[in-house]
Amino acid sequence: KNERIFRLQFEKPLTIVLEEPEVHLHPKLQSAIADILLDAYKSFNFHFIVETHSEYLIRKTQVLVAQMGFESNVESVEKSPFVTYYIPENSKPYSLGYRKDGKFMESFGTGFYDEASNLAFELL
């Protein structure tokens, strides 16, 4: 009954802005944020704008897209609920888009996904 009342109050999408929700969280919990956001989106039609530097959170969105068969840039019921923008230094933001396998259609600039690999190679 409470859920029904809650849903009635939010018939229109509610947009919530989260700034670095991963701060001070263990990597496993950082990735779980994506599950929570997807559940809130599907259950209550909540929309989120999330500013993050968490590779774990972003990678989890890719996993969810692959598991659920979502895809960007298609007009269908299975359109991805996630939209990821990369904001390069001294340049304009751009959407990465998701393929059905969860991989991005565009690439991140240097210094994000490649940073951990670069540091590992320095140890060799």
Show the residue positions of the predicted features:
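Switch/communication elements of ASCE P-loop NTPase nucleotide-binding domains
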Residues: 1-120
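Conserved helicase/translocase motor-coupling segment
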Residues: 122-124
